[in-house]
C-alpha cells in the first residue's frame, strides 16, 4: 500500500514553481513514506507568490555565512558600505574606498619590514611603462582619462631630457603648427606670423612644410596667403623656406611621372606664388613650362596654362625674353591643332589675360606684399637637382641635446620678435644666431607703418556703396544693404558723400535719396552727425556745382531738415549778408527753404525759426546787429516768398534809428569835453554859425572813406549834403560840414538830423535819416556835409537823394560826387 501510493504520487508532473522541495535522498533512502508522513508533507506546502509581486531587481548582495576555511589569523578588511541610489556609482565608490584601505594596510605592514618603498617603486615603474607604451603607439593606445593623463605628463615633465617629455613637446608643437596654419588668412596673417615664430620652427620645420602643403592642396584659393606666410618665415629662417620649396618640386616631379593632374596643378600653383614672392628663382618656373609644353597633351596644356596665369606677370617683369618664348610656344601649339578644342580655348583666354596685363591675376595680391624684395632670400633650386626631402623630419626622434637646442631657438626668437624683457646676447655664438642679420629685426615695425597713399580701399568702398544704391529697388532695400557694408570706423562720412553725390547726378531730384538719408539719420546718432558735417561742407563748396546739381543737393538737405533728420542748428553756417554770400550760396539756401516750405508749410517754418533755443543758430540768417545786413536779409527772404519770417527784423529796423540816436547822444555827451580844443581853429574859419568843428574829420579823412548824404529840407539853406572821401582839405567850405565814418574826436551834441530815406512830402517835419553804410555813431544835427573842394560852391536849388533812398520819385536835379577833389568844384549842373 505505501509503495503503490508512492508510485502513484511521484511521477505526477508539477510545475517548477509549485513543486515541493525534494526530500533528502540520504534520509529517505533507508525507509519509505508512511501515511503519517503524507499529511505532514502537504502541510509544509505554501502557495507560490505571484510573479507580478516580485521585485524588479534581485538583491544586490546575499548574506552568506562565513566560510569555514577562512584563516582567523589573517588580517581582515571590511568592505565599505556606501549608500547610493545608483548601484553602479555605489559599486565604484566602494571599490575606490576598498583600494584605499588596502593601500593603507600595506603601508602599515611595510613600516617594519621596508615594503613601502618597493610598493611605490613598482607603481612608478608601472605608470612609466604604461606611458611609454602610450607614446610609442601611433594610434595613441587605449583611452586614458584626462586626469590620469595629466598626472602622467606631469610625472614625465620632471625630467626634460627624457624621451617622454620630448614626445609630449613634439605632439604639442605639431598641434600648434597645424592650428596656426589652418586659421591663417589675409586679415590675420600679421598676427599668425609672431605666433609661428614663437614655436620651434627649426625643430619642427618638417611639420611646418607638411602642414602648409596639405593646407594649400585642400584650399587652392588661399595659395597666395600660404606663399606669403612662407616668404615671411624664409626671411628669418631660410632653411624652412628651402625645405618647403624642395618638397614641392619633388612632389611635382612624382605627380608628373604618375600623370596626376590634380596634384600637378596644386603644386605648380604653390611654386608659382613662391616665385612671385621671390622665394623660388624664375628658372624653376621656366623649366616647368618647358616641361609641360615639350610634348603637349590636354592635361599638360591645362597645367601650363594655369601655371602661366599665376606666374605670367612675374615673368613678364623679370624675364621678358623668356616670357615671349613661352608664349610663342603656346601659339605654336595652338596652331598645330593637336589638342582638344577646350585646351585651344584655354590658350586663347591666356593670350587675352596677357593682353589685359593680368589685371585679374596679380603677382602679389593686395594685402600680401609684406616682404621687401631686397630682404627676401631666393633659393635657386631646379627640377634637375638631387633633392633631399628629409622625410625623417616629420617623425619624432629623441634629441640628446634637447635643452641646449631649445635655449638656442629661444635666443633666435628674441632676436626675431624683439623681446626686450628677456636677456639677449647669451647665445650669440650659436650656429643659429650667426645666420641672422641685425637689420632684419626692424621688418615688423616697418610693415606696421605702411600707408596706402593711393586710397585704393577708399575707392573700392565708394564703388561698393554706389553699386549697392543703384541695384536697390526702394530706399528700404538700399538702407538694408548699405548697413551690411563693412565701413571702417571714422569713414561714415564717405557713405553720406556718396548718397549726396548720387543724388546730384540725377537729371531731376528723386525722393529716393532723401528717404535714404532720413532713414540713416534716424537709425543712429553717428549718421546724423555725419550728414550735419556734410551740410556744412557742401554749403562751403556749393559754388563748384552747376545749377542742376545744386538744385538736387539743396532739395536733399531741405528734405532732411523738414523731416528732422538733422538739426536745424546746422543753419548757423548761413550768414545772410552781401559780403559773406555768393549767388550760388543764396540760390542753395533758397532751394533748401523752398523745399522745407513745400513739405511743412510757411507757418510751421516761421514758428520753428522763432524757437528761442534755436535763435542763436539763426542769428546769421536773420541779422539784427546791423541795419544794412537786416535790410539785405529782409529783401532776400521777401524776394523768395518768405516775408513772414522777416517780421522780427522789420520791427528791429523801425526801432533802430531811435536806439542808434540814443546811443550816439550818450557817446557824444561823454566825449564832448575832448572836442573843444580840436574844433577851435575850424570854428573861426567857418562861415556857418551852426556848423561843428571839422578839424578832426579833416585830419582823419585821409584814412576813412566817407559817403555823401542829402538833406530833405527845401528851405533857403543848402538842401544837399555830401560825404567826402579821402578829404585832404584843412578846412571845409562855408555852410558845409565834413563827417568821418570813424570820428576820433567827439563833437557837440546835435540838435536834429534828417533821413532822406523816409521823406516823401515837399515840406515834412524834420525826420531822421539813417545811412546803411555808417557803422560808427555820428551826431545827427541839422548840418550839411561838404565836399573836398577848397573853395565854396553855390548851394543847389534842389535836393539830392542818397544812395540808400527808396523814394518812389527820383530827384529832379543831381549833383556829382567829387572824390579826392583838389580843386574847387564847379556849380552843379542840371540834367
Curated annotation (Swiss-Prot):
GO terms for biological process: mRNA splicing, via spliceosome. Residues 1-89, 414-450, 670-831 are annotated as: Disordered. The keyword Protein transport does not apply. Residues 73-89 have a biased composition (Basic and acidic residues). GO terms for molecular function: RNA binding. It is found in: Cytoplasm; Nucleus. Residues 433-443 have a biased composition (Acidic residues). Residues 460-576 form the MI domain. InterPro entries: ARM-type_fold, CWC22_splicing_factor, Initiation_fac_eIF4g_MI, MIF4G-like_typ-3. Associated with the spliceosome. PANTHER family: CELL CYCLE CONTROL PROTEIN CWF22-RELATED, PRE-MRNA-SPLICING FACTOR CWC22 HOMOLOG. This is Pre-mRNA-splicing factor CWC22. It comes from Cryptococcus neoformans var. neoformans serotype D (strain B-3501A). The gene is CWC22.
Amino acid at each position: 500500500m505505501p509503495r503503490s501510493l508512492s508510485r502513484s504520487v511521484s511521477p505526477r508532473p508539477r510545475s517548477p514553481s509549485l513543486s515541493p522541495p525534494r526530500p533528502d535522498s540520504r534520509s529517505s533512502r533507508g525507509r519509505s513514506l508512511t501515511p503519517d508522513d503524507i499529511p505532514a508533507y502537504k502541510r509544509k506546502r505554501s502557495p507560490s507568490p505571484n510573479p507580478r509581486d516580485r521585485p524588479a531587481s534581485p538583491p544586490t548582495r546575499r548574506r552568506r555565512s562565513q566560510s569555514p576555511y577562512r584563516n582567523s589569523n589573517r588580517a581582515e578588511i571590511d568592505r565599505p558600505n556606501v549608500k547610493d541610489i545608483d548601484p553602479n556609482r555605489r559599486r565604484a565608490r566602494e571599490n575606490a574606498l576598498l583600494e584605499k584601505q588596502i593601500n593603507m594596510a600595506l603601508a602599515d605592514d611595510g613600516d617594519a619590514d621596508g615594503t613601502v618603498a618597493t610598493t611605490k617603486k613598482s607603481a612608478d615603474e608601472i605608470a612609466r611603462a604604461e606611458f611609454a607604451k602610450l607614446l610609442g603607439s601611433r594610434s595613441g593606445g587605449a583611452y586614458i582619462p584626462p586626469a590620469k593623463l595629466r598626472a602622467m605628463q606631469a610625472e614625465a615633465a620632471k625630467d626634460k631630457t627624457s624621451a617622454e617629455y620630448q614626445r609630449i613637446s613634439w605632439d604639442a608643437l605639431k598641434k600648434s603648427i597645424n592650428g596656426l596654419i589652418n586659421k591663417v588668412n589675409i586679415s590675420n596673417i600679421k598676427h599668425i606670423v609672431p605666433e609661428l615664430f614663437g614655436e620651434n620652427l627649426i625643430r619642427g620645420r618638417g611639420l611646418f612644410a607638411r602642414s602648409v602643403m596639405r593646407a594649400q592642396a585642400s584650399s587652392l584659393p588661399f595659395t597666395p596667403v600660404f606663399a606669403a606666410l612662407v616668404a615671411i618665415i624664409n626671411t628669418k629662417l631660410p632653411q624652412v623656406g628651402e625645405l618647403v620649396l624642395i618638397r614641392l618640386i619633388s612632389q611635382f616631379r612624382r605627380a608628373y611621372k604618375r600623370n596626376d593632374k590634380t596634384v600637378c596643378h596644386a603644386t605648380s600653383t604653390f611654386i608659382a606664388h613662391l616665385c612671385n614672392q621671390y622665394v623660388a628663382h624664375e628658372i624653376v618656373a621656366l623649366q616647368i613650362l618647358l616641361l609641360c609644353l615639350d610634348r603637349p597633351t590636354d592635361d599638360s596644356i591645362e597645367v601650363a596654362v594655369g601655371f602661366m596665369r599665376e606666374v605670367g606677370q612675374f615673368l613678364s617683369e623679370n624675364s621678358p625674353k623668356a616670357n615671349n618664348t613661352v608664349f610663342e610656344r603656346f601659339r605654336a601649339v595652338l596652331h598645330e591643332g593637336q589638342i582638344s578644342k577646350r585646351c585651344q580655348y584655354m590658350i586663347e583666354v591666356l593670350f587675352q589675360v596677357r593682353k589685359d596685363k593680368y589685371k585679374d591675376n596679380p603677382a602679389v595680391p593686395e594685402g600680401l606684399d609684406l616682404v621687401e624684395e631686397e630682404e627676401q632670400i631666393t633659393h635657386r633650386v631646379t627640377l634637375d637637382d638631387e633633392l633631399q626631402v628629409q622625410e625623417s623630419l616629420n617623425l619624432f626622434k629623441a634629441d640628446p641635446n634637447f635643452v641646449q637646442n631649445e635655449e638656442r631657438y629661444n635666443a633666435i626668437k628674441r632676436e626675431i620678435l624683439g623681446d626686450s624683457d628677456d636677456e639677449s646676447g647669451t647665445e650669440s655664438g650659436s650656429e643659429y644666431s650667426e645666420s641672422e642679420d641685425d637689420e632684419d629685426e626692424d621688418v615688423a615695425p616697418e610693415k606696421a607703418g605702411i600707408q596706402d597713399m593711393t586710397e585704393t580701399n577708399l575707392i573700392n568702398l565708394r564703388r561698393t556703396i554706389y553699386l549697392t544704391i543703384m541695384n536697390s529697388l526702394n530706399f528700404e532695400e538700399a538702407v538694408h544693404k548699405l548697413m551690411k557694408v563693412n565701413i571702417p570706423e571714422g569713414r561714415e562720412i564717405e557713405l553720406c558723400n556718396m548718397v549726396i553725390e548720387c543724388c546730384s547726378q540725377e537729371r531731376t531730384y528723386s525722393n529716393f535719396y532723401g528717404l535714404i538719408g532720413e532713414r540713416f539719420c534716424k537709425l543712429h546718432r553717428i549718421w546724423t552727425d555725419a550728414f550735419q558735417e556734410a551740410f556744412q561742407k557742401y554749403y562751403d563748396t556749393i559754388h563748384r556745382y552747376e545749377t542742376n546739381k545744386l538744385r538736387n543737393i539743396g532739395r536733399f538737405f531741405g528734405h532732411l531738415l523738414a523731416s528732422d533728420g538733422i538739426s536745424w542748428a546746422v543753419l548757423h553756417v548761413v550768414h545772410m549778408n552781401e559780403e559773406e554770400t555768393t549767388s550760388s550760396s543764396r540760390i542753395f539756401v533758397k532751394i533748401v527753404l523752398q523745399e522745407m516750405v513745400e513739405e511743412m508749410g510757411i507757418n510751421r517754418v516761421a514758428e520753428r525759426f522763432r524757437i528761442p533755443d534755436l535763435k542763436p543758430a539763426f542769428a546769421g540768417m536773420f541779422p539784427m546787429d546791423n541795419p544794412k545786413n537786416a535790410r539785405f536779409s529782409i529783401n532776400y527772404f521777401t524776394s523768395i516768398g518768405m516775408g513772414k519770417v522777416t517780421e522780427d527784423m522789420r520791427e528791429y529796423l523801425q526801432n533802430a534809428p531811435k536806439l542808434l540816436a540814443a546811443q550816439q547822444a550818450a557817446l557824444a555827451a561823454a566825449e564832448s569835453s575832448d572836442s573843444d580844443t580840436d574844433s577851435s581853429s575850424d570854428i573861426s574859419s567857418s562861415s556857418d554859425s551852426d556848423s561843428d568843428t571839422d578839424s578832426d574829420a579833416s585830419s582823419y579823412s585821409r584814412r576813412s572813406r566817407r559817403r555823401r548824404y542829402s538833406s530833405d529840407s527845401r528851405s533857403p539853406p543848402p538842401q544837399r549834403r555830401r560825404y567826402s572821401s579821402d578829404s585832404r582839405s584843412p578846412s571845409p567850405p562855408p555852410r558845409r560840414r565834413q563827417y568821418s565814418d570813424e570820428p576820433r574826436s567827439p563833437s557837440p551834441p546835435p540838435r536834429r538830423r534828417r533821413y532822406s530815406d523816409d521823406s516823401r512830402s515837399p515840406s515834412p517835419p524834420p525826420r531822421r535819416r539813417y545811412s546803411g553804410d555808417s557803422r560808427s555813431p555820428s551826431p545827427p544835427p541839422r548840418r550839411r556835409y561838404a565836399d573836398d573842394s577848397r573853395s565854396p560852391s553855390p548851394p543847389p536849388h534842389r535836393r539830392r537823394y542818397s544812395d540808400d533812398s527808396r523814394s518812389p520819385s527820383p530827384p529832379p536835379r543831381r549833383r556829382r560826387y567829387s572824390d579826392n577833389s583838389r580843386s574847387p568844384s564847379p556849380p552843379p549842373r542840371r540834367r
